[in-house]
């Protein structure tokens, strides 16, 4: 059966009312804002009541560089939560919520798969509780207010050529990357070049995911730099005097969403920045709540350890106030063979030699996560085409690095298929973690970037081209150089070239621009040809989707 067929079959008979799931966490119905029987948001009063509660253990799930189809990181995260519950623990899962772009495009949703899913799967993958729509509305409201300011006299002296703020849409639409607005004469606005980002790449998504409460949300929104004046001074949302209006639109979106797995493990799904063009982690509020309500919180960071993993460590943990007690790196035989040079069409054929070549990619990610001083476990997400020889090679190769590697079959078997991973994680949690920061936040921007390139990617140098050098001068001039850096880079490679696979060394990362995101609290470093508005593939997943006359959805994976 497909993911949606499994979800539909189980939702009808086994899904608990969300009030029952919440009761298992010690929450009453008064702590919830219900969205039907299966979804709820936590109220601000419930969040405030938890603020002094101690944290449990934190497990971060990340991965190697993936194939275009993804390697099942969310599936492993869900399955691990279910497996830990079977071991008598009280885990709480914290995931990002899906963007419609990948849902309608190629990669799929973010609810796991098979018998390791969060439900209601259709709702979560589509409109859920409306968070993405609220974010899109807030982004576009701010854009409209900026253009209205230009039209109504421009008292802030904003230079239309230097506006940074873009509009947003939660779908892949390459035709909107570069647009001209304000056409049609004097009553239709000030003509200027503009563009659209996908909603999850907008700074407001990062702000939502890093904000600790309404006051912090407003402070972060107010700091957002929307552009520059004619004399090149930064203009913020606070300067426009619309901080309160934008925060108002995001009031409910700030509250974490509570759902459940097919095995009733509680899961907070909240916020969804991409890891290749943003910081790739779910909200601080959701992760913090999971830490306070369970004895083990399991969360994931987008794409590989070079992207979401690094950003979780260097951007999210300082705000969260908690570092991981263990890291799980998800690997698949097919992705390692892909990194070893095997074509996509041949990945189901046994090839231990290519697997050995591709193993260097996993080795690089293991070393990068170990450099933070945290115990590492490798979870091999097993597919039916994997052979015993290939699996044994991976287990033995990891053992030579003193890393425990175990297989998982959670897609087919649910939590039962993740018990080996759960046991390895529990053993890792018994080891001491001595967290070490990758770089000093007070170091200069170039030093921070080069440190990531050398210590995480395995590269040698950084080349600054295009707008990057003038952007650096602006950052230093305005005193923003102490912010952490958020690398925008292809997810398919450790380099900035998606076609360079494996674990190359001695390469140069090409930085074309550095964009200050003062609300989020980091500097986005644009490398290679990465885009903040993706395009749909030649054969979008949307072509296989439908809804019957009685409202039953099909084709959603």
UniProtKB/Swiss-Prot annotation:
InterPro entries: Formate_THF_ligase (IPR000559), Formate_THF_ligase_CS (IPR020628), P-loop_NTPase (IPR027417). One of its GO terms (molecular function) is formate-tetrahydrofolate ligase activity. It is an enzyme of class 6 (ligase). The keyword Iron-sulfur does not apply. Its EC number is 6.3.4.3. It catalyses: (6S)-5,6,7,8-tetrahydrofolate + formate + ATP = (6R)-10-formyltetrahydrofolate + ADP + phosphate. Pathway: One-carbon metabolism; tetrahydrofolate interconversion. The keyword Signal does not apply. GO terms for biological process: tetrahydrofolate interconversion. It holds the Pfam family FTHFS. This is Formate--tetrahydrofolate ligase. It comes from Lacticaseibacillus paracasei (strain ATCC 334 / BCRC 17002 / CCUG 31169 / CIP 107868 / KCTC 3260 / NRRL B-441) (Lactobacillus paracasei).
């Amino acid at each position: 059966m497909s993911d949606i067929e499994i979800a539909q079959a189980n939702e009808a008979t086994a899904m608990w009312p969300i009030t029952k799931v919440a009761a298992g966490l010690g929450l009453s119905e008064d702590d919830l804002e219900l969205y039907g029987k299966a979804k709820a948001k936590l109220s601000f009063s419930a969040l405030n009541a938890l603020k002094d509660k101690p944290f449990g253990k934190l497990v971060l799930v990340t991965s190697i560089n993936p194939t275009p189809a993804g390697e099942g990181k969310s599936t492993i995260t869900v399955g691990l939560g279910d497996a830990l519950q079977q071991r008598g623990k009280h885990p709480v899962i914290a995931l990002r919520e899906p963007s419609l772009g990948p849902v309608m495009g190629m990669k799929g949703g973010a609810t796991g798969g098979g018998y390791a899913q969060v439900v209601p799967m259709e709702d979560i993958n589509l409109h859920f509780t409306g968070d993405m729509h609220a974010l899109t509305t807030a982004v576009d409201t701010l854009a409209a207010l900026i253009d209205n300011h230009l039209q109504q006299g421009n008292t802030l002296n904003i230079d239309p050529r230097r506006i940074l703020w873009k509009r947003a849409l939660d779908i892949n639409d390459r035709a909107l990357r570069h647009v001209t607005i304000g056409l049609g004469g004097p009553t239709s606005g000030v003509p200027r070049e503009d563009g659209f980002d996908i909603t999850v790449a907008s700074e407001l998504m990062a702000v939502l995911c890093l904000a600790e409460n309404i006051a912090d949300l407003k402070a972060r929104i107010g700091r957002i730099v929307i552009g520059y004046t004619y004399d090149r001074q930064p203009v913020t949302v606070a300067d426009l005097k619309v901080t309160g209006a934008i925060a108002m639109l995001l009031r409910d979106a700030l509250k974490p969403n509570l759902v459940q797995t097919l095995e009733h493990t509680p899961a907070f799904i909240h916020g969804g920045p991409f890891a290749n063009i943003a910081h790739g982690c779910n909200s601080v509020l959701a992760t913090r709540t999971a830490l306070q309500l369970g004895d083990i919180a399991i969360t994931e960071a987008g794409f590989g350890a070079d992207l979401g993993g690094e950003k979780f460590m260097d951007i999210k943990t300082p705000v969260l106030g908690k570092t991981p007690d263990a890291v799980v790196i998800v690997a698949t035989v097919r992705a390692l063979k892909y990194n070893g040079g095997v074509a996509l069409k041949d990945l189901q054929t046994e090839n231990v030699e290519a697997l050995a070549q591709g193993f260097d990619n996993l080795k690089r990610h293991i070393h990068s996560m170990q450099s933070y001083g945290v115990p590492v476990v490798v979870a091999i997400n097993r597919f039916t085409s994997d052979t015993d020889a290939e699996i044994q090679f991976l287990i033995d190769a990891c053992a030579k690095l003193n890393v425990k590697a175990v297989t998982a079959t959670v897609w087919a078997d649910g939590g039962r298929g993740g018990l080996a991973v759960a046991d390895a994680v529990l053993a890792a949690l018994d080891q001491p973690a001595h967290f070490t920061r990758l770089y000093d936040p007070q170091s200069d921007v170039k030093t921070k970037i080069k440190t990531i390139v050398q210590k995480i990617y395995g590269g040698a140098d950084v080349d600054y081209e295009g707008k990057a050098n003038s952007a650096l001068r602006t950052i230093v001039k305005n005193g923003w150089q102490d912010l952490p850096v958020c690398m925008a880079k292809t997810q398919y490679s450790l380099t900035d070239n998606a076609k360079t696979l494996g674990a190359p060394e001695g390469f140069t990362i090409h930085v074309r621009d550095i964009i200050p995101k003062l609300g989020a609290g980091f500097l986005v470093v644009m490398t290679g040809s990465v885009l903040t508005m993706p395009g749909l593939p030649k054969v979008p997943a949307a072509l296989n989707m439908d809804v019957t006359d009685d409202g039953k959805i099909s084709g959603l994976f």
